[in-house]
Design a protein with these regions (language model features):
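Post-HExxH zinc-binding segment in Zn-dependent metallohydrolases
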Residues: 97-132
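Auxiliary, metal-adjacent structural segments of Zn-dependent hydrolase domains
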Residues: 1-59
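Active-site recognition of the HExxH zinc-binding catalytic motif
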Residues: 77-90
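Flexible, surface-exposed loop/gating regions in the mature catalytic domains
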Residues: 91-95
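Pan-zinc metallopeptidase signature
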Residues: 140-151
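Extracytoplasmic/secreted proteins, especially bacterial periplasmic and envelope-associated proteins
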Residues: 18-21, 74, 78, 99, ...
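Short pre-active-site segment immediately N-terminal to the catalytic Zn-binding motif
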Residues: 62-78
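Anionic, Ser/Thr-rich low-complexity intrinsically disordered regions
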Residues: 51-54, 80, 99, 109
């Protein structure tokens, strides 16, 4: 697994250290999520926006500062969520849109429970409807939504 800090977004050594801690939390508390991450994602890098980047090789999970600066349990659960999108992509399933995000959210909720996340994170995740990708509220995921991301 390549871990790449970027001083424009998040500097090393903090980035590498916390990402490794999140990966280790998945390894010890959520082996399935760890397996998906290690098996399907080749790189985790600091970026302006969080998400699964299928347009680069290897498949990459981008992590923005807002996500990085959250708790270790939240960061680990986001890595799990994004790795599920990598699994969907590799299995030639739909990896964007409402149903894909609902699946990712359910998976993230399961992982939050497995890794002992605070109840506040679990309750927050339970309230998510899967439409967080549609930031301009036009009913579809497009580049405008991507560029509006602050997480």
């Amino acid at each position: 697994m390549q871990i790449e800090a970027d001083v424009r977004y998040i500097a090393d050594p903090q980035f590498t250290k916390k990402i490794n801690e999140a990966i280790d939390l998945l390894r010890t508390q959520s082996p399935c999520a760890y397996g998906n991450l290690i098996g399907c994602v080749g790189r985790i890098r600091a970026a302006q926006r969080s998400g699964t980047n299928i347009n680069v090789t290897p498949l990459t999970v981008d992590i923005a500062s807002a996500t990085f600066n959250a708790s270790i349990t939240w960061l680990a659960s986001v890595l799990a969520h994004e790795s599920l999108h990598a699994v969907q992509f590799l299995n030639k399933q739909t990896y964007t849109g409402l149903e894909s995000e609902k699946e990712g959210n359910a998976y993230q909720l399961m992982v939050l429970r497995q890794i002992g996340a605070p109840q506040s994170e679990i309750v927050y995740m339970m309230k998510q409807t899967g439409d967080h990708f549609d930031l301009n509220k036009n009913g579809k995921y497009d580049w405008d939504d991507y560029y509006r991301r602050t997480y």
